[in-house]
Amino acid sequence: MNGFVNIAQLKQLVLYLQGEIFPDYYPAVERPDGLCLPDAFWAQVPEIARLINTDVDAVLHNDPAVPDRGEVILSYPLQYAMIHYRAAHVLHQLGVPRIPRMLTELAHSRT
């Protein structure tokens, strides 16, 4: 995939991964209470995207040197970090072990 993806494309990718690549593994990632972790995470993606948009807006409104949203998204390391931190937060809330820490450390090492 090149360029940006939207929520519909992400959902299509998830369905592909569920059905084609991980058909045996996917159902195995359920918690004892029956919550399917990938489904629970992907259900939060629109909210993560909304929050990231508010992060972009905050930079745009508070940095007079920024001409538009595109510059914030493409050139600010903050955005790279916030995407990882927001996803890690959702995973942590779902009780996923290790991966949230890995995501935050990845963002930390790059920013």
Predicted regions and their residues:
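Terminal amphipathic alpha-helical/low-complexity segments used for targeting or macromolecular assembly
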Residues: M1-E105
